Regions:
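Extracellular adhesion/carbohydrate-recognition regions
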Residues: 1-78, 115-116, 127, 145-156, ...
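An exposed tryptophan-centered "aromatic clamp" motif
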Residues: 54-78, 83-136
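Carbohydrate-recognition loop of C-type lectin domains
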Residues: 138-145
Length: 160
């Protein structure tokens, strides 16, 4: 479901669409102590680049990135959104949820205990240990150890 149409020349693609279902809880990494090469920039729309960095890291394994790449079998080049991309999704939630439901998908949750999702953005200064969780219930962010398991909601970039 399309949730953002890009108006900026400095951002890749024509917009973003969100996947209809969550990815079951997975850890960002199977161990801590390794910066996985993702951005720590909270304003960057770089989830695609970050997801490739997670997938390509050889010093540790990313169960989360592996699950996202499993989606590629169906011809969708999905990735884990960055913090900035999650902010856009959160802002559009009221508009996209009814469409997600009509398509048979799982709406983005509001419940406090059920609304936290991984982003692909690592925590600045703590890249070896933490990444950001994002609440689709409130728009809040939480520094989280990479070895914890949480859900993700993949997105894709729309191109010409």
């Amino acid at each position: 479901v399309v949730f953002h149409i890009n108006q900026r020349e400095d951002v890749e693609g024509n917009g973003y669409a969100v996947y209809l279902w969550d990815i079951a809880p997975e850890s960002f990494a199977d161990s801590i102590g390794v910066a996985q090469g993702t951005s720590a920039d909270l304003t960057a729309y770089d989830g695609n680049t970050n997801t490739f960095a997670l997938y390509g890291t050889t010093d540790t394994f990313s169960p989360l990135a592996e699950k996202v790449f499993d989606i590629w079998r169906y011809g969708q080049s999905a990735y884990i959104p960055s913090v900035a991309q999650m902010r856009l999704l959160y802002a559009a939630k009221a508009v996209v949820n009814p469409i997600i439901e009509k398509c048979g998908g799982d709406p983005l949750p509001d419940e406090t205990n059920d609304c936290w999702y991984w982003t692909s953005t690592e925590v600045k200064g703590q890249q070896a240990a933490k990444a950001w969780l994002y609440s689709l219930g409130s728009g809040a962010m939480q520094e989280t150890p990479k070895i914890q398991e949480h859900r993700a909601r993949p997105i894709i970039t729309l191109n010409d």
